[in-house]
Regions:
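Secretory/exported precursors with cleavable N-terminal leaders
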Residues: 1-185
Length: 185
């Protein structure tokens, strides 16, 4: 398990969590640990059924307090074939060799038609004491704020399934959203 002191705390009534800013401050890692009486599946449903602007407001308005964060190292790969999804959205001709019109992209020397044969979406995330690797991005930082008054230190120990988010702080947009279900201590 990795330990760090953070300064942004979340408590939405169903989960507690923290935000860990990366170098430069544009991106951050957010961990949300469902309360002991809330399953990960139920918490994910709660997030999915909450208006997006309310979720963004929660993620952009943490309590400014000390958080003792403890989390496992983890890594996941994900691959999704998008052909059927794109066809369902109306892009069926682009996948049909006889109907596709991709001539503005180029021409085959033998005169055959260009078409889309496969669209894959792959993600990779790895979090350890050296930082986070998500796609081709690697960076990590700990921000510290000086406090003149003693404050209560919140504690979040990610020792059961939790939700994580790689968040773009400038655009208030989640870049990656996932869950860790196998906790390796």
């Amino acid at each position: 398990m990795m330990r760090s002191k953070e300064y942004a705390y979340f408590d939405d009534g169903y989960a507690t969590g923290f935000r860990k800013n990366y170098t430069g401050g544009r991106y951050s890692f957010i961990a949300l640990l469902p309360n002991e009486d809330v399953s990960l599946a139920d918490y994910v449903k709660t997030l999915a059924n909450t208006a997006p602007e309310k979720v963004v407001k929660m993620l952009t308005s943490p309590q400014s307090t000390s958080v003792q964060a403890t989390m496992p190292k983890f890594g996941y790969d994900f691959e999704l074939r998008l052909n059927d999804i794109l066809i369902a959205l109306g892009l069926s001709d682009a996948f049909n060799a006889s109907k596709a019109n991709l001539s503005k992209l180029g021409k085959c020397s033998d005169g055959s038609n260009l078409y889309i044969s496969e669209v894959l979406h792959k993600t990779h995330i790895e979090v350890d004491e050296r930082g986070t690797k998500a796609g081709a991005v690697t960076s990590v930082a700990v921000n510290a704020e000086a406090s003149m008054y003693p404050e209560e230190i919140k504690e979040v120990t990610l020792d059961r399934p939790f939700v994580y988010i790689i968040f773009d702080n400038e655009t208030s947009t989640p870049i990656f959203i996932g869950s860790v279900t196998d906790i390796q201590k």
